[in-house]
Regions:
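The Walker A/P-loop phosphate-binding site
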Residues: 2-112, 123-132
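Substrate-engagement module of ASCE P-loop NTPases
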Residues: 81, 167-194
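Loop/turn-to-beta-strand initiation segments
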Residues: 85-87, 139-144, 190-194
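Catalytic P-loop NTPase motifs of RecA-like helicase/translocase cores
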Residues: 97, 153-154
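Flexible beta-alpha connector loops of hexameric P-loop NTPases
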Residues: 111-121, 159-176
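Short amphipathic alpha-helices and their capping/turn segments at secondary-structure boundaries
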Residues: 127-145, 184-186
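Walker B catalytic acidic pair
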Residues: 149
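Conserved ATPase-coupling elements of RecA-like P-loop NTPase cores
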Residues: 154-162, 188
Length: 194
């Protein structure tokens, strides 16, 4: 049966397809990133020593100024502590992260790359380019990606409308965000990047 399924998978041309008994590449959880909080670890993974899956996208949601950025930085610190050769790719939409903040939280700033982004399209292009390169690279180092914050990302249409003095609402924003994460979710999972 296995050879039959393998031939079907091969003929599909789907690089992400696989047989469930052999593990589903990008879907099966292979480990966890400790959040630094036993209670939050238990909520997310069912174990005090778990945390966020190391190959899944996770969103921190909450009102403005409730500490989401600081919590994300705490997870970055824990990730770097647990992965001595790991790096952080931090997409910052608010120009909020500084090298001092990184240092003050005990992280080596030479292991944290900050990517200022203003639009969903810019984030999508840069993130997909990085993930594609990561997948191609043999012996890649562990990577943790943070987008802070999704809510602050504009679209190119919104930026253009604002520049032209239009006050119309961009009705395409939700679709652009959804399309971005449809592509990124599969690619990040395949690459094993949280």
């Amino acid at each position: 049966m296995s050879d039959f399924l393998k031939s079907i998978i091969k003929s599909s041309g789907n690089e992400y397809a696989g047989i469930a008994s052999e593990g589903i590449d990008g879907s099966d959880v292979t480990g966890f990133i400790d959040t630094g909080s036993y209670a939050f670890n238990a909520l997310l993974s069912g174990s005090l020593y778990g945390g966020i899956p190391n190959n899944k996208i996770m969103a921190l949601a909450g009102e403005s100024a409730t500490g989401k950025t600081y919590f994300a930085l705490g997870m970055c610190k824990k990730f770097l502590d647990d992965n001595p050769d790991g790096v952080i790719l931090y997409f910052d939409t608010e120009q909020a992260i500084t090298s001092d903040m990184v240092r003050e939280r005990g992280m080596d700033p030479s292991r944290v790359a900050i990517f200022p982004v203003a639009t969903v399209e810019t984030f999508r292009h840069q993130a997909i380019s990085i993930v594609d390169k990561y997948i191609e690279t043999k012996d890649s180092k562990p990577v943790f990606v943070v987008l802070d914050s999704l809510g602050m990302l504009s679209t190119e249409k919104e930026m253009n409308d604002t520049a032209e003095g239009k006050s119309t609402r961009d009705m395409t924003r939700a679709q652009v965000i959804k399309a971005t994460f449809r592509v990124l979710t599969l690619k990040l999972g395949k690459a094993g990047i949280p």
